[in-house]
Regions:
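Hydrophobic/small residue at the entry helix of a nucleotide-binding pocket
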Residues: 12-15
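Helix N-cap at the beta1-alpha1 junction of Rossmann-like dinucleotide-binding domains, i.e.
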Residues: 36-39
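Rossmann-fold cofactor-recognition segment
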Residues: 49-63
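Conserved Rossmann-fold cofactor-binding substructure of NAD(P)-dependent oxidoreductases
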Residues: 61-74, 87
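N-terminal Rossmann-like NAD(P) cofactor-binding module of classical short-chain dehydrogenase/reductase
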Residues: 71, 77-81, 102-103
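Rossmann-fold NAD(P)-binding glycine/threonine-rich loop
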Residues: 106-133
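C-terminal catalytic/substrate-binding lobe primarily of soluble NAD(P)-dependent oxidoreductases
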Residues: 155-410
């Protein structure tokens, strides 16, 4: 019997738990745990059945002893980590103690940092090997599905690849014209930090928003984009090192950019803690707490968002460019799951990865990313979970220009 422990009952659980509940043949028993047991209990009431038992538990991953006791009592085969990414290492430690396989959606980003530390998770490789356990890291959409897209493109679409551009249209509207549909902390981090790209075997940085581009995305249209930092660059450059150039471009509303410029000018995007009546708090952390949360935005989001991988290379010596992409409707996701389109995309990837682990298709001791496995079974499972993808042959060019400006946002 496959017993799954889900750690974290935040916004992403809104899509993960329903998707797990649709697969009782693979997940016979689920324990939903989080800091709010009341919230966990709502999933038990809604989804527990004769075919699939759901139990709940309170968990504070920072309380090591109580968390370990709870996990040992439940004795899961697999732990799905939905906690904030800065807690990844603590959850990995837990899996080693209770001898359970591990799965997360986001790479480890130390608290207060703007960059992921993929090597910190890979440092656990030998420990998981010694225990005979599998740990799959970065199994969301981005990274995750994007890694599979890269592997698929290299094996099936092109003979050689010279350039990979991740294009996140970040599209759709909501009732807050100055806010994006993606998490506030993610968007703020991306536009406040230096842009990064992988080229000639190393990662280089450029000033924030200094590289602009335009792209015509299927069913969305032509939008302005900026090259930004993203953990998928670390993932792809590590797992697919033969790719000469890897970049990440994302779109932002002009009103959002204007708001962030003002906040940045007055110091509110700083990650350096300041003393307020004896309490140490980073301005960015405070800002994130007082701004509307993604749950509020998802309820009013409309339109579609699209993310794709534009691969440039050659087939039989002739230049070829193709776009592998996914499109998701904001309203449809909220009506079905009460979740954002972004969370659904990551949830579908995560549950597909969980399926790969419990069925033995991803049984490999140590710490791995999904690009180490044949991408086609995973992509097939992704479609079964409701997230389709398409391939656009003869894809349009990405129009890139240096020295972008914030005024060039949508």
């Amino acid at each position: 019997m496959n017993r799954v422990l889900v750690i974290g009952c935040g916004k992403m659980a809104r899509a993960v738990i329903p998707l797990l509940a649709r697969n009782p043949e693979f997940f016979r028993e689920i324990c939903v745990s989080g800091r709010s047991k009341e919230k966990c209990d709502t999933y038990k009431k809604k989804y527990s059945s004769d075919k699939q038992k759901i139990v709940t538990a309170f968990v504070d991953i920072n309380n090591k002893e109580k968390t370990r006791l709870m996990a040992k009592i439940y004795n899961p085969d697999l732990v799905i980590n939905l906690a904030p990414s800065y807690l990844n290492l603590k959850v990995m430690d837990l899996c080693l103690e209770i001898e359970a396989n591990y799965l997360d959606a986001s790479l480890y980003i130390p608290k207060g940092s703007t960059q992921c530390d993929i090597n910190a998770e890979y440092a656990y490789d030998q420990k998981f090997r010694e225990k005979g356990l599998t740990a799959i890291i970065g199994c969301g959409f981005n990274p995750g599905v994007m890694n599979a897209f890269g592997q698929y493109a290299a094996g099936k679409l092109l003979d050689e690849i010279s350039k990979v551009d991740i294009i996140d249209m970040n599209a759709g509207t909501n009732a807050h014209p100055y806010l994006m549909n993606t998490p506030m902390n993610t968007s703020l981090r991306q536009i406040s930090s230096e842009g990064r790209m992988f080229t000639d075997g190393k990662i280089i940085s450029v000033p924030p928003l200094s590289v602009q581009a335009k792209y015509s995305f299927p069913e969305i249209g032509k939008r302005n984009l900026f090259m930004v930092d993203h953990e998928v660059i670390d993932a792809l450059s590590t797992e697919l090192p033969g790719m000469p150039t890897i970049r990440y471009f994302s779109g932002f509303k002009r009103t959002f950019m204007s708001m962030v410029k003002v906040l940045r000018d007055v110091g509110m995007t700083s990650t350096t803690p300041v003393d307020i009546d004896g309490q140490q708090i980073a301005p960015l952390d405070f800002l994130y707490e007082v701004m509307p949360q993604q749950d509020d935005l998802a309820a009013t989001a409309k339109g579609k968002t699209g993310i794709g991988m534009l691969v440039t290379g050659a087939v039989e010596g002739e230049k070829k460019q193709e776009l592998i992409y996914a499109l998701v409707d904001h309203q449809q996701c909220y009506e079905e799951f009460g979740a954002s389109a972004t969370d659904f995309m990551s949830a579908a990837a995560l549950v597909s990865g969980a399926n790969m682990i419990v069925t033995g298709q991803w049984k490999q001791d140590g710490v791995h990313m999904i690009s180490e496995f044949d991408p086609q079974p995973f992509l097939k499972e992704l479609k079964r979970q409701g997230l389709d993808y398409k391939v656009l042959e003869e894809a349009p060019d990405l129009e890139v220009s240096e020295h972008g400006t914030e005024e060039e946002a949508e």
